[in-house]
Amino acid sequence: MGLNFTKMHGLGNDYIVINEFDGEKIKEDEKAEFSKKICKRGFSIGADGVIFVQPATDEKYDIRFRIFNSDGSEAEMCGNGIRCFSKFVYERVMQKNPLNVETMGGLRVSEMNIENNIVKSIKVFMGAPTFELKDIPMVVEGKSENDVFLDEEIELKNALLNSVKLSVVNVGNPHAVIFMKDNNLKAPFIRTHLNILGKEIEHHSVFPEKINVHFVEIVNPQEIKIITWERGAGYTTACGTGTTSSVIIANKLGKTGNKVLAHLDGGDLEIEIKEDGVYMEGDAVIVYDGELYQY
């Protein structure tokens, strides 16, 4: 008998969902290597990451969300992933709405728009952002761990750019946001050289635990476009926490309002900044169920 799984995606960001709510399917010390192996496109199922549905470890949560990237690293949070997770949980595990989700990045609350017991869209309370360098983490000469890094430059070592101006924020996981116009960059240039630029910034020495990278174009105060390079996954069609971070930084620097429509390669997300925190809204899709025999 094989291992049951569900393939899902959120704006083209695709995941393999493993239901461990009623018991462990993959041993804890094997989850990283398992995820790395089955995410390899062309050789196994192929995905940007693996989501494990688990019982909560504390009664204040309804259920636990865990996600491993395609390189085997475990991430604290994932915006597109948690929307997929929430749809899966409501339709396959427990019909609870809203859903209090335990993540490594803290509590996330999913509120689902439901029609005929099918989840059509999910609004997730993403919590409040943190900007201090200790929360990224980021190590910068001349700055303390309580300082922030907003609209400042870091040096690069590639032949394309000597430096780049960026801002950093943590929304459960860390993100670097780069506004293309402020760096005299155009989207075609970024797309052509994303493997070089995204990878170098992700692995830059100032980020000891690496970082997610987003190149942002401001369309108008209510609309942005984003090109994403995810930590541990590389280019992806969308990133929910990255979109949230991009809007937070854009708003903080006076470039956008509190409610923004973000266009990503995989589709659109709506982000709203309120007094109690930030909300992300978008859909999620169950593509197919399957059974894995070699892993």
Swiss-Prot record:
The pathway that the record names for this protein is: Amino-acid biosynthesis; L-lysine biosynthesis via DAP pathway; DL-2,6-diaminopimelate from LL-2,6-diaminopimelate: step 1/1
Q: Name one GO molecular function term.
A: diaminopimelate epimerase activity
Q: Does the keyword Ribosomal protein apply?
A: no
Swiss-Prot/TrEMBL keywords: Amino-acid biosynthesis, Cytoplasm, Isomerase, Lysine biosynthesis
Question: Which InterPro entries does the UniProt entry name for this protein?
Answer: DAP_epimerase_AS (IPR018510), DAP_epimerase_DapF (IPR001653)
**Active site positions, chain numbering:** C78 (proton donor), C239 (proton acceptor)
Residues bound to substrate: N13, N69, G79, N80, N173, N212, E230, R231, G240, T241
Which Pfam families would you find in this protein's record? DAP_epimerase (PF01678)
Task: Look up the signal peptide feature and give its range.
Answer: none
Q: Name one GO biological process term.
A: lysine biosynthetic process via diaminopimelate
Reaction catalyzed = (2S,6S)-2,6-diaminopimelate = meso-2,6-diaminopimelate
Q: Where in the cell is it found?
A: Cytoplasm
EC assignment: 5.1.1.7
Q: Name one GO cellular component term.
A: cytosol
EC top class named in words: isomerase
Q: Which residues are annotated as site, described as Could be important to modulate the pK values of the two catalytic cysteine residues? A: H175, E230
Which cysteine pairs are joined by S-S bonds? none
Task: Describe the family membership recorded for this protein in Swiss-Prot or TrEMBL.
Answer: Belongs to the diaminopimelate epimerase family.
Q: How does it assemble?
A: Homodimer.
Role, per record: Catalyzes the stereoinversion of LL-2,6-diaminopimelate (L,L-DAP) to meso-diaminopimelate (meso-DAP), a precursor of L-lysine.
Query: Do you know which NCBIfam families this protein is assigned to?
Result: DapF
Q: What is this protein called?
A: Diaminopimelate epimerase
- Give the species: Methanococcus aeolicus (strain ATCC BAA-1280 / DSM 17508 / OCM 812 / Nankai-3)
Q: What is the lineage of its organism?
A: Archaea, Methanobacteriati, Methanobacteriota, Methanomada group, Methanococci
